[in-house]
Amino acid sequence: MTIEIQAQQRADQGSSASRRLRRAGVVPGVVYGAGKAAVAISFDHNTLYYALQKEGFHSSILNLVIDGATEQVFVRDVQMHAFKPQVQHIDFQRVDANTVIEAKVPFKFINGEISPAVKMNGKIIGHLLNAAVVRCLPANLPAAIEVDLSTLVAGESVHLSSIKLPEGVEFASLRSGKDLSVARA
């Protein structure tokens, strides 16, 4: 799934300029990384807000079109208003096809209703993590990681080390020796 989003380069920077943009229905942002200079950009608020609602937007490589030039990026940070459905600021990081990146990818839990813990013991499965940071090349970045709960028994946990990942993808926390629990019955 390739998502394309349109942006315009902006000259005005700072909190006053950003406030003026937000009042005009425009979201300030920045794109940086891959050895290039940071570029201040802006987006139409409604277009960006509805793009953020898509499932794979936060964990996919996106095509960012800035005044006609396309760059491959992924979302590094999104700042939302405290109580309004309003995007305050967004950061994108450029990606190089040959450089390993670290990105947060959500879990998709499957087969929980047929696990022995639920069917035989009447347990409720608790999801301890909703996402994890993975290391991979940009081309290998998954939109979501499936966690199969069909073999989960009462009193047991599913750990990061037991989750099957696509080729070329690894959990960043396992590199540092932290085998976190993902779900427990």
Swiss-Prot record:
Signal sequence region: none
Organism: Laribacter hongkongensis (strain HLHK9)
Summary of the function given for this chain in its UniProt record: This is one of the proteins that binds to the 5S RNA in the ribosome where it forms part of the central protuberance.
Keywords assigned: Ribonucleoprotein, Ribosomal protein, RNA-binding, rRNA-binding
Gene3D superfamilies, A to Z: Ribosomal protein L25, beta domain, Ribosomal Protein L25, Chain P
Subunit description: Part of the 50S ribosomal subunit; part of the 5S rRNA/L5/L18/L25 subcomplex. Contacts the 5S rRNA. Binds to the 5S rRNA independently of L5 and L18.
GO biological process: translation
Record-stated family: Belongs to the bacterial ribosomal protein bL25 family. CTC subfamily.
InterPro entries noted in UniProt: Rbsml_bL25/Gln-tRNA_synth_N, Ribosomal_bL25/Gln-tRNA_synth, Ribosomal_bL25_b-dom, Ribosomal_bL25_C, Ribosomal_bL25_long, Ribosomal_bL25_short, Ribosomal_L25_dom, Ribosomal_uL5_bac-type
CC annotations in GO: cytosolic large ribosomal subunit
A GO molecular-function annotation: 5S rRNA binding
Protein name according to UniProt: Large ribosomal subunit protein bL25
Gene of this entry: rplY
